Amino acid sequence: MHETGKITRKAILLSYWVDEHEKFKSDLDFGLVKSFLKSAAGGCFRDEEIGEYASVFFTRKSLFELLDCYDYMFVYFSGHSLFENRQVQIPLKNSEVIAESEFIRPDKKLWIFMDCCRTQREPMNSPDFELPRKENLFPQSCPQRRENWVFKISQMEPFSLIYYVTKLGEFAFSNAIGGFGTQIFFTTLMEKLDSETTFDFGQLVREINQSPIAIQESSYIPGSLDLKEFSSLF
């Protein structure tokens, strides 16, 4: 499952949808995220290291058990969520929920990616937007790049990076082929990695927010994470 003696890792992609059309959009977003995860920039994840789930598959207990099993986890969520006490609340099985802060586990390394609204306001229609799905330009996976990535993250101190596709109190929009935040993050990342030799995560987020096609503003909480060290993973 992973390089022996270095680090255990898992990516879990979660979604909450209410009809087949929303499930279709979620599946497209999952595909884009998986393209990144399987690439050299994302860590050369193998299929068995990536789990795709409806969020209601999990109870709180079973999700916590999964989170506690690995040294590094990439957690992605898209779809409908609740919002309470200034936190995203993800619906789970048996009407349970998990708050975004509860994903953070002691002594673990986590990147949490939230493509959902962060407001209690009544939903509004998404503005029109079009982000063409581009060919996969992420750097290709290979055994050496995988080994290097695993070694680098194994040397990092525990961290919890939370990336939000929208600001506190705002909506996250989508169209027929998925969430705006997921699409613009990974397509912009793809373009930068294809054209630049030095990558900077903070600069990526600034460019996303300054894009002339931006309809929402992303943000992130790095906690104790060394962003320069994290950027070297890409």
Label every PLM stretch briefly.
Residues 1-234:
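Cysteine endopeptidase catalytic domains of the caspase/legumain-like
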